[in-house]
C-alpha cells in the first residue's frame, strides 16, 4: 500500500465482488474493475498480469495478489505468497478486509455491510429470508447472476453499470437508500413478480434421489428468476441439490451443486467432487461443465457419490 500504485480488480459480478471493490477503492488500490466468470479464469481466457488484483476467483499465475476463500483452490494450487486464501473465511471480502487491517483501516459504519456479505457468501440465511427477502438479503439475491433477472428485461442500465454505481453509492449510503435507487427497484420489482411462478417451476422440474434433489431445467422454455436457496425451502427433506442447465450457447451441460442451507448434514465436499470433472467450488457449493455426450454418465456418478455420502 505504500507505493501508491493502483491496480485493476478482477472479480465476480456479485455482492462479494461489490464489497471487495468498495474495500479496495477505499484504500486507493484499484482504479479499474473487470467482472469475469470463474471458469474463464481457470481456462486462461482472461489475460491477467502484475497490474491485476483478483478476488473470489481461481488463482492465475502472474497476478499481483489474489484473495479467495474457496476450499478447492487450496487443493488445486501450491501455496504462494501472493495467494491470500482462507477457506474458513465466510467471504472473499472478509479475507480482503482482514488482510488490510479490518476496523483499523475501514469505517466502523461498514460493519453491517461486512456482516451482510459474510452472511450472503456463506449462505447463513433462515427460511423467512429466503422466501421473503428484505434489505441486504434482497440486494444479495438480485445481484446474484444465478437469480436470473437479466434473462427477462433490458434494464435501463446494464448489470456492469449498476455494479459501478453501487461501488460508489454503497460506501456512504444505507441499505434502505440503496434499495430505493431506481435501477435497484427495477430489479426487485421483477424479482417479486416472478416469485410464485419460480416456486411452481421448481416443484414441476425437480426429482428426489434419496437425500438429493435434482432440478433439470433444460427443457423449460422460460426459466423464471428466483434465488437459488428456494429449492431447499420447498424440499426440506433433501440436504443437497444439483441444478442441470445448458452451458453458454448450449455448448455443454452445467451441473451446479449446492448443499441445503437449512439441513447442513451432507458430508459431501462439493468443491472436491466438482474438481473431478474439471470444475471447482468449496465445501458447500460448486459447479462443473461437461460435454453433452458425457452428461448422463456424469449425473449418474454424481448422484451415486452424493447418495453414498448422504
Q: Which residues does each predicted region cover?
A:
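Long, charge-rich alpha-helical interaction segments
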Residues: 145-185
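Active-site rim beta-loop-alpha module in soluble metabolic enzymes
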Residues: 168-217
Amino acid at each position: 500500500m505504500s507505493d501508491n500504485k493502483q491496480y485493476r480488480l478482477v472479480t465476480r459480478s456479485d455482492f462479494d465482488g461489490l464489497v471487495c471493490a468498495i474495500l479496495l477503492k477505499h484504500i486507493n488500490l484499484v482504479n479499474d474493475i473487470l467482472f469475469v466468470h470463474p471458469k474463464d479464469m481457470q481456462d486462461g481466457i482472461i489475460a491477467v498480469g502484475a497490474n491485476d488484483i483478483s478476488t473470489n476467483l481461481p488463482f492465475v499465475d502472474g497476478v499481483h495478489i489474489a484473495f479467495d476463500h474457496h476450499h478447492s483452490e487450496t487443493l488445486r494450487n501450491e501455496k504462494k505468497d501472493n495467494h491470500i486464501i482462507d477457506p474458513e473465511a465466510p467471504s472473499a471480502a472478509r479475507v480482503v478486509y482482514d488482510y488490510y487491517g479490518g476496523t483499523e483501516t475501514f469505517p466502523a459504519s461498514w460493519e453491517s455491510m461486512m456482516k451482510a456479505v459474510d452472511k450472503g457468501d456463506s449462505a447463513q440465511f433462515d427460511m423467512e429470508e429466503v422466501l421473503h427477502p428484505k434489505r441486504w438479503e434482497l440486494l444479495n439475491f438480485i445481484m446474484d447472476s444465478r437469480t436470473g433477472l437479466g434473462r427477462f428485461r433490458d434494464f435501463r442500465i446494464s448489470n456492469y453499470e449498476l455494479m459501478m454505481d453501487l461501488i460508489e453509492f454503497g460506501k456512504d449510503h444505507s441499505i434502505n437508500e440503496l434499495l430505493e435507487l431506481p435501477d435497484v427497484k427495477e430489479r426487485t420489482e421483477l424479482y417479486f413478480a416472478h416469485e410464485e411462478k419460480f416456486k411452481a417451476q421448481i416443484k414441476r422440474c425437480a426429482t428426489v434421489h434419496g437425500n438429493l434433489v435434482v432440478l433439470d431445467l433444460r427443457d423449460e422454455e422460460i426459466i423464471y428468476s428466483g434465488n437459488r436457496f428456494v429449492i431447499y425451502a420447498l424440499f426440506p427433506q433433501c440436504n443437497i441439490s444439483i441444478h442441470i442447465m445448458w452451458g453458454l450457447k448450449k455448448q455443454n451441460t452445467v451441473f451446479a451443486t449446492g448443499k441445503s442451507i437449512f439441513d447442513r448434514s451432507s458430508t459431501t465436499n462439493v468443491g472436491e467432487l466438482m474438481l473431478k470433472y474439471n470444475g471447482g467450488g468449496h465445501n458447500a457449493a460448486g459447479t462443473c461443465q461437461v460435454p453433452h455426450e458425457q452428461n448422463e454418465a456424469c449425473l449418474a456418478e454424481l448422484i451415486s457419490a452424493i447418495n453414498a455420502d448422504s
